Regions:
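Alpha/propeptide regions of enzymes that mature by internal proteolysis
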Residues: 1-315
């Protein structure tokens, strides 16, 4: 029997104990990842995932999430999902109930969620709405979004929204995506990723969290890896897959993450081009890397009473 392990990115500590409880009972890595991530998505103090996530430039919360299992490389994801608070569960349902597809986005993702009995909810909290309005006022005085009746007001809003996309993409964080990777007692692995994406992003933007090989990759021949940060870079670099390929070649998890991030950092990008990655191997070794000093990840084993923070290797 394999010793179960679960690791997560910054702010996953809210959910990891729920995931480890599943693993202690002999549950699957997939069940553990879903249980842990749902706790994170339901955490109203976290403005970068689930309910309370910061909205797009139009003031609408859009969520991305994915799950992938290591033994068969099954993958399910949703992108730009509106109105459903637990996208990780909808992503799992895509994988299990809609095997002819891997990824649903926008209206199609919401239709699938409704058809499969997921309960809808208002995702924009008062606090997140206030943060959005503050940014609009900072960018253009007295603009109230598309409720503004004047043509000139609408024009100013759209211009401000585009400026917000450009200004907020390189914001100072914390980087919002949550990564969780689990190894169960049967040797199966699962990677889960969930996010509300860049604050005030262009409507419809889908990042690396919903794309296999970019923000999420799991293959028992190497392990599991996930990314957070500048998603457009990991989309271009296939960063999560690169990490796992390096694990399969024998690199230690922290080194594999570092090498993959160094490769992605070499891509030209005018925004803040920092990525973070973490990885777990089928024999339970784990590590992470980041382009910012002081970055950590969280880990729990069967012997843990609470998540332990570990430093990431600096790129």
């Amino acid at each position: 029997m394999t010793q179960p392990v679960i690791i997560g990115s910054e702010r996953s500590e809210v959910g990891l104990p729920a995931g480890m409880e599943v693993l202690r009972r002999g549950g699957t890595a997939l069940d553990a990842v879903e249980a842990a991530m749902r706790r994170c998505e339901d955490n109203l103090t976290d403005h970068y995932v689930g309910t309370g996530g910061l909205p797009n430039a139009q003031g609408v919360v859009e969520l991305d999430a994915s799950v992938m299992t290591g033994s068969d490389r099954r993958f399910g994801a949703v992108g730009a999902l509106r109105g459903f608070p637990n996208p990780i569960s909808v992503a799992r349902a895509v994988m299990e109930r809609l095997p002819q597809h891997c990824l649903l986005v926008g209206e199609g993702a919401a239709l699938f969620a409704r058809e499969n009995g997921f309960e809808g909810a208002e995702l924009l909290t008062d606090e997140s709405r206030a943060m959005w309005r503050e940014q609009l006022l900072t960018a253009a005085e007295a603009v109230e979004g598309e409720n503004t009746p004047a043509v000139d007001g609408d024009h100013r809003y759209r211009r401000a929204a585009l400026e917000l996309v450009r200004r907020m993409a390189p914001h100072e964080g914390p980087w919002g995506t949550i990564n969780i990777v689990a190894l169960d007692a049967h040797g199966e692995m699962c990677v889960g990723v969930s996010t509300s994406g860049y604050p005030f992003k262009y409507p419809g933007r889908v990042g690396d969290s919903a794309v296999p090989g970019a923000g999420n990759w799991c293959d028992l021949r190497g392990g599991g890896a996930a990314c957070t940060g500048r998603g457009e870079l990991s989309l271009r670099g296939g960063t999560a897959r690169t990490v796992v390929d390096l694990l399969a070649l024998g690199k230690e998890p922290a080194d594999a993450c570092r090498v993959a991030l160094e490769e992605a950092a070499g891509l030209p990008d005018e925004f803040r081009s920092e990525l973070r990655a973490l990885a777990l191997t089928p024999d339970g070794r784990h590590g992470g890397a980041a382009g910012q000093e002081g970055s950590v990840y969280a880990v729990m084993t069967d012997a843990s009473t609470e998540p332990e923070l570990r430093p990431r290797t600096l790129v």
